[in-house]
Amino acid sequence: MTVARLRELLPDYARDLRLNLGSVTSQSNLSAQQLWGTVLAAAIASRGRTVLVELEPEALDHLSAEAATAARTAAALMAMNNVYYRSLHLLEDEEYSRLRAGLRMNALANPGVDKVDVELWSLAVSAVNGCGRCLTAHEHELRGRGVAREVIQDAIRVASVVHAVAVTVEALETSSGTNRVAAAD
């Protein structure tokens, strides 16, 4: 199961996504670990079963066990943080920001891989989940660690394409296209 297989599942109306998926996974300013950790974290965050089934094995071919665990951890913890911090932002009451969050995130303290990579994966998941406060925080941390804007942009590009592919494939599976996707298996 590969990027190529997932690209084959995309219908003609999603040709741009097909091309974008190929380009973001082959031409990047990200290291291989950063790229495939971003792919894995974004696939998890996108909640698309088929997308995760198709992309995870290829991602695991490029990631150490520690990196795969760190990408999964980033996806899991950002699922929590993105809801929490996006909600605080939307409430528009700064008093909530002064309250202790009380949410455990110990796994991010020692992720077993370079913290820049985990920040990129957290940024990508935050992009998928639409948390502006988290995006700003992760971008600020990455820029403070000397990460170029082009690298940050590539992580966001990967996340946006993976998410769009997940939405498109899920729509196919839900609509009359279900048989078409299932038949491709």
UniProtKB/Swiss-Prot annotation:
Pfam (any one): CMD
Under InterPro entries, the record lists:
AhpD, AhpD-like, AhpD_core, CMD-like
Q: Which GO terms describe its molecular function?
A: alkyl hydroperoxide reductase activity; disulfide oxidoreductase activity; hydroperoxide reductase activity; peroxiredoxin activity
Q: Which UniProt keywords apply?
A: Antioxidant, Disulfide bond, Oxidoreductase, Peroxidase, Redox-active center
Q: Decide whether keyword Disulfide bond is in the record.
A: yes
Keyword Oxidoreductase carried by entry: yes
Domain of life per record:
Bacteria
> Would you kindly state one Gene Ontology biological process term found in this protein's UniProt entry?
cell redox homeostasis
The chain's disulfide connectivity reads: 131-134
Entry EC number(s): 1.11.1.28
Q: Which residues form the active site?
A: 131, 134
The family classification in the record reads:
Belongs to the AhpD family.
HAMAP family assigned:
AhpD
Record note on quaternary structure: Homotrimer.
Full protein name: Alkyl hydroperoxide reductase AhpD
- Species assigned in the record: Frankia alni (strain DSM 45986 / CECT 9034 / ACN14a)
Organism phylogeny: Bacteria, Bacillati, Actinomycetota, Actinomycetes, Frankiales
